[in-house]
């Protein structure tokens, strides 16, 4: 590929990976809001499911946004909703357990919070769809670039794309240390008067590309497993 093609792909990839990064952060904040709202409206639910952030749980809370609404739900409808949303994983016993917990819940009946919960779930679903679209575009560029970075165990196309996008031309860096410095991950040195500390007593500088720093940090976690 020509330099122009490579530069174009890098710029496109950078735009897409940064856009995805911002969308994922936005979604994470909304998920925190979901947890907060459930604690108010139906705190017992969290102990009944592996995670609040599941398709089946969102389907339940979209239609019945609180313990009071779930407590008054018809069991047949509740069972069908959970079964469909979980693709058969949750059946009648789960519906009974959830409704019984709702009927004994200490959760508050707050219509405003219930409405906020429904709207937050809707926003998360929209973000899920947007992130999926972005990832399709990222994968298309990664396929064009044919980089070997994703052959490294633990590095998928998301992290690989972000690393490629932020570093660009690897030949610009003559050592791994230079890449770490560019990411703001090189140890800082504290100096005061005659005292100079580095190594075990230092912290990361946290300058440079926060996107690259995020990608390298997360990639390292999986590569080291």
What are the roles of these predicted feature ranges?
Residues 1-225:
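A detector of single, family-specific signature residues
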């Amino acid at each position: 590929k020509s330099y122009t093609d490579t530069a174009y792909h890098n710029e496109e990839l950078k735009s897409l990976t940064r856009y995805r990064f911002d969308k994922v952060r936005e979604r994470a904040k909304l998920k925190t809001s979901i947890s907060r709202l459930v604690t108010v409206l139906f705190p017992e639910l969290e102990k009944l499911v592996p995670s609040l952030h599941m398709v089946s749980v969102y389907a339940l809370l979209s239609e019945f946004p609180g313990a009071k609404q779930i407590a008054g739900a018809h069991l047949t409808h509740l069972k069908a909703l959970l079964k469909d949303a979980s693709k058969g994983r949750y059946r009648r016993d789960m519906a009974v357990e959830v409704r019984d917990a709702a009927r004994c819940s200490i959760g508050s009946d707050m219509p405003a919070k219930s409405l906020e919960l429904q709207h937050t779930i809707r926003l998360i679903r929209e973000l899920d769809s947007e992130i999926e679209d972005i990832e399709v575009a990222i994968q298309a560029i990664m396929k064009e670039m044919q980089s070997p970075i994703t052959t490294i165990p633990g590095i998928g196309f998301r992290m690989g794309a972000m690393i490629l996008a932020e570093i660009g031309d690897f030949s610009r860096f003559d050592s791994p240390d230079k890449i770490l410095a560019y990411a703001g991950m090189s140890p800082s040195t504290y100096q005061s008067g005659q005292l100079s500390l580095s190594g075990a007593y230092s912290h990361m500088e946290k300058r440079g590309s926060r996107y690259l720093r995020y990608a390298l940090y997360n990639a390292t976690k999986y590569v080291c497993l």
